[in-house]
Amino acid sequence: MSDEEYSIYDEVEIEDMTYDPALQTYSYPCPCGDKFEIALADLQDGQDIAVCPSCSLMVRVIFEVDNLPKAPDAAASIAVSA
């Protein structure tokens, strides 16, 4: 979607967001009292809009893909039987 299709509340540096490694999501406080959220996988796919699930506000996340945490390798979590 183009910028015209979004009503962006603000731009937020990813360093100002909180990362939850268990959920693999970034969050940032929303003025409504909830949190803007965006998944690590979405950021890695080039998406940069975090949304608040409680209101209509959205923020643009400023980040470099190369600086994101690496997603856990699904194959690495599978035990290999001998």
UniProtKB/Swiss-Prot annotation:
Query: Known InterPro entries for this protein?
Result: DPH3/4-like, DPH_MB_dom, DPH_MB_sf
Segments forming domain DPH-type MB: 8-64
Summarizing the function annotation, the protein's role is:
Required for the first step of diphthamide biosynthesis, a post-translational modification of histidine which occurs in elongation factor 2. Dph-1 and dph-2 transfer a 3-amino-3-carboxypropyl (ACP) group from S-adenosyl-L-methionine (SAM) to a histidine residue, the reaction is assisted by a reduction system comprising dph-3 and a NADH-dependent reductase, predominantly cbr-1. Acts as an electron donor to reduce the Fe-S cluster in dph1-dph2 keeping the [4Fe-4S] clusters in the active and reduced state.
What family does the database annotate?
A: Belongs to the DPH3 family.
**UniProt domain comment:** The DPH-type metal-binding (MB) domain can also bind zinc. However, iron is the physiological binding partner as zinc binding impairs the protein electron donor function.
In which pathway does this enzyme or protein participate?
Protein modification; peptidyl-diphthamide biosynthesis
Q: Which reaction does it catalyse?
A: [3Fe-4S](1+)-[protein] + Fe(2+)-[Dph3] = [3Fe-4S](0)-[protein] + Fe(3+)-[Dph3]; 2 [3Fe-4S](0)-[protein] + 2 Fe(2+)-[Dph3] + NADH = 2 [4Fe-4S](1+)-[protein] + 2 [Dph3] + NAD(+) + H(+)
Pfam families xrefs: Zn_ribbon_CSL
Which residue spans traverse the membrane? none
Example GO molecular function term?
iron chaperone activity
What subcellular compartments does it reside in? Cytoplasm; Nucleus
* Protein name, entry field: Diphthamide biosynthesis protein 3
How is the subunit organization of this protein annotated in UniProt?
Component of the 2-(3-amino-3-carboxypropyl)histidine synthase complex composed of dph-1, dph-2, dph-3 and a NADH-dependent reductase, predominantly cbr-1.
The superkingdom of the source organism is Eukaryota
* Record's GO cellular component terms: cytoplasm; nucleus
Q: Which GO terms describe its biological process?
A: protein histidyl modification to diphthamide; tRNA wobble base 5-methoxycarbonylmethyl-2-thiouridinylation
Q: Which residues bind Fe cation?
A: 30, 32, 52, 55
> Which key words are in the record?
Cytoplasm, Iron, Metal-binding, Nucleus, Oxidoreductase
UniProt cofactor(s): Fe(2+)
